Curated annotation (Swiss-Prot):
Family to which this protein belongs: Belongs to the universal ribosomal protein uS15 family.
Organism: Corynebacterium diphtheriae (strain ATCC 700971 / NCTC 13129 / Biotype gravis)
Role of this protein: One of the primary rRNA binding proteins, it binds directly to 16S rRNA where it helps nucleate assembly of the platform of the 30S subunit by binding and bridging several RNA helices of the 16S rRNA. Forms an intersubunit bridge (bridge B4) with the 23S rRNA of the 50S subunit in the ribosome.
Keyword Ribosomal protein: yes
The protein, known as: Small ribosomal subunit protein uS15
One example GO MF annotation: rRNA binding
Superkingdom of the organism of origin: Bacteria
Keyword entries, A-Z: Ribonucleoprotein, Ribosomal protein, RNA-binding, rRNA-binding
Name of the gene encoding the protein in the UniProt record: rpsO
PANTHER family assigned: RIBOSOMAL PROTEIN S15, BACTERIAL AND ORGANELLAR, SMALL RIBOSOMAL SUBUNIT PROTEIN US15M
Subunit structure: Part of the 30S ribosomal subunit. Forms a bridge to the 50S subunit in the 70S ribosome, contacting the 23S rRNA.
Annotated GO CC locations: cytosolic small ribosomal subunit
Length: 89
């Protein structure tokens, strides 16, 4: 259920600021969004998996905090990221 190494590398290559970037808010939010999407699909089939649901809520909270940080510090990067990820319709 976790992201494979290849999936992580492709996400980091697309959203990271440079090739080995793993710490920028954009890279972290992109990885969290991929994990959130995976867990959301899992929960569509396993509705009573409450442990995974709690994990999903923790990931959403972590992503929300990183997005808040990015919005407070650099609005242009924030708007670009949410547009690229398709968040906030």
């Amino acid at each position: 259920m976790a992201l494979s190494t290849e999936q992580k590398k492709s996400i980091l290559a697309e959203y990271g600021l440079h090739e080995t970037d793993t710490g920028s808010p954009e890279a972290q939010v992109a990885l969290l969004s991929a994990r959130i999407n995976q867990l959301t699909e899992h929960l569509k089939f396993h509705k009573h998996d409450h442990h995974s649901r709690r994990g999903l809520l923790l990931l959403v909270g972590r992503r929300k905090g990183l997005l808040k940080y990015l919005a407070d510090n650099n609005v242009d990067r924030y708007r670009d990221l949410i547009a690229r990820l398709g968040l906030r319709r």
